[in-house]
Swiss-Prot record:
Stored Pfam families: GatB_N, GatB_Yqey
Protein name, entry field: Aspartyl/glutamyl-tRNA(Asn/Gln) amidotransferase subunit B
Biological-process GO terms, alphabetical: glutaminyl-tRNAGln biosynthesis via transamidation; translation
Function: Allows the formation of correctly charged Asn-tRNA(Asn) or Gln-tRNA(Gln) through the transamidation of misacylated Asp-tRNA(Asn) or Glu-tRNA(Gln) in organisms which lack either or both of asparaginyl-tRNA or glutaminyl-tRNA synthetases. The reaction takes place in the presence of glutamine and ATP through an activated phospho-Asp-tRNA(Asn) or phospho-Glu-tRNA(Gln).
Subunit structure: Heterotrimer of A, B and C subunits.
Family (UniProt): Belongs to the GatB/GatE family. GatB subfamily.
HAMAP family: GatB
Keyword Ligase: yes
InterPro entries recorded: Asn/Gln-tRNA_amidoTrfase_suB/E, Asn/Gln-tRNA_Trfase_suB/E_cat, Asn/Gln_amidotransferase, Asn/Gln_tRNA_amidoTrase-B-like, GatB, GatB_C_1, GatB_Yqey_C_2, Gln-tRNA_amidoTrfase_suB_CS
Native organism: Burkholderia ambifaria (strain ATCC BAA-244 / DSM 16087 / CCUG 44356 / LMG 19182 / AMMD) (Burkholderia cepacia (strain AMMD))
Single GO molecular function: asparaginyl-tRNA synthase (glutamine-hydrolyzing) activity
Amino acid sequence: MATQWEVVIGLETHAQLSTVSKIFSGAPTQFGAEPNTQACPVDLALPGVLPVLNRGAVERAIRFGLAIGSTIAPRSIFARKNYFYPDLPKGYQISQYEIPVVQGGQITIQVPANEKAGKPAYEKTVNLTRAHLEEDAGKSLHEDFAGMTGIDLNRAGTPLLEIVTEPEMRSAAEAVAYAKSLHALVVWLGICDGNMQEGSFRCDANVSVRPVGQEKFGTRAEIKNLNSFRFLEEAINYEVRRQIELIEDGGEVVQETRLYDPDKRETRSMRSKEDAHDYRYFPDPDLMPLVIGQDWIERVQAGMPELPAAIQQRFVEQYGVSAYDAGVLTSSKAMAAYFEAVVAKAGAANAKIAANWLMGDVSSQLNRDGIEIDAIPVSAAQLALVLQRIADGTISNKIAKEIFSAIWDEKATDEAAADRIIDAKGLKQISDTGALEAIIDEVLAANAKSVEEFRAGKEKAFNALIGQAMKATKGKANPQQVNELLKKKLG
């Protein structure tokens, strides 16, 4: 990407709130029901019906606001956002415009290292502009009707919290890191189930470019309804390339709304981008202003869980893990709880190795089986014993992986499964110096060429000899002990 251009990204994220009923009616919000079976007269905009605000939706918005350190508006207004679309029965959407319920706030993100670009991992704080309550629209179904479009109003009126950032992100990597952090937070708080496939969490990305050093923002394009982190990254990267190439070829970027085509991995124009005045916002006369007293905020505060940021800091200070690792370990409540349970059994001295295992072998196995950490077949106590056996020298790290896989595959229920498997398969590390010296002597005799190369100054030859020694012991030798004995014998 051309280094003379700076990327500017702001995200608008729609988080579907986990209420049982809709934001202005008593209709259910269950996903996957038959079309138009979860829409009541309010959702259908039939004459003579009035909206009634769902208290649970408001409390979830307050909970989010408290978590990000925002200001909870003591008085906020619902407004009508006027536009025509077939799946919007009223001809307007009830949203918030001038006075949102959540104002300001910030989220600290951990941006992973980019080894190809030579960029290390770093931390960044993203400021939020606002978060406001609104209702979702229905859904247009194009595939099932030849030449026609079906309208499913089950989703109409589902409560959403639209979360808007300042245009402070400068790369797709930062945008994805923010989206992942936000996703983890709303799920952690219990205000959204975070199911991206069902549309419970989706992002709109506002993307522009400008010459490095220029203060004025470039013309932005909005990419709508990105419902996976991969699509978000691909869409932003494509859009940045498109805009830079367009400008460098003498063209101008048009303010518009675009869609991302994941098959072609490109964005395409959908419609011209509207401004606020196009929607003719005005206060909804059917809804009173939302008044939130301090006592209400305090009641919500009393029910708040320990937040990921606080736990991350505790993990760094108490266990000595890196800030990035702490961020991964708090990606979900279940992951954080599992890590703490492992450390409680294995001891704080083994916290770093526990963190490495959770981010490595454990995550790899979870991905392989397509399950979440709360469904892991290896208990925290079982993994802790594996780590203890590495620490006390009973087994090597390589053998530990074999034991972990065995416990996983057999879905063992006994807490001492690691010891049982070690004994049954004879996997104890060979730490007897005499026995190891005999094996190393055989390895040196059989690999005279490598010995000569090492003595000639080739360090790789030494690694080859270690590999041969480990192979001769079937991975059961203590690697450190092998290293020391080889150095001793090779002088």
